């Protein structure tokens, strides 16, 4: 009797072990197959997103992706009687390209490839869809932008950074922020870039910085920021140079001897602003402007500033028609270099969302009218129901 009970117990244990082993094996097969099916879904990435903007993303809603996985599973398990496939469910929300985190991760990866020289500035345009709704143009493309509701403007580098007289600009190479900006300046053009493909904004980097709805407003906002930045830097140089300080003191004594200290500060600021205006003209004409000036790179003379200052009764006047002075700078950042400083200083979330804006605007304008970046995903979670159990698989680009 005891022997029979032991035999039954052993058989039960063995059968339980066999069943558990079988389930583990089935789950292993299902997990490997599930990863392969997810890989197939990821392989259907949008070519325009990839070729024009260096991003991987596939289009689809959760129900459609589940149907694809079900189809793959039924084909794979059709001749496997020990596997009973009971369907799948998918989760895409976490992987939307409209997520700042997801977009940033891809932008940083691509930015690193740009910095390494592996990826170049794209020379291809956006191809219109063969069978889709008609592309839209005009102000209609500005509707439902990812950055809608964000009002934060451009940030300048801190006055401490600008005023301490560093030879180099404050952009720190090698950080994720730096690689984001490399991505933006590679895949979006600024006002000085040659037109290689039709886009809505001529100055796309300027849009990222300013967020206005017209090129004119964006350019004006960026120029104002450059003027402010260069004025602070130029003033820092004037205050460090004894010869220039002596000139401004003498000019202040002539203009307002009874209030010389206050007038000297006004003259110094006016001189720095006049030099900043000239700096902006140089930058917008493709020239370089050193981050911190020296005697060779300083272009304006105080006499001209004083004449303008006196003519306006104490208010500096920078006439738009005045030709700029080119000191022939060899070193220093160009216009794109200064935009990089402004990009580096601005709010990262706003910056990423405005980059999404540009992609959505241009894709709606050139690809198909109902394009929304939120409908594209960079990965998926899938839950497979196999033999009464659940198997989870996850895959990203």
Sequence positions of predicted segments:
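Alpha-helical assembly-interface signal, strongest on the long, hydrophobic N-terminal helix that forms
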Residues: 1-64
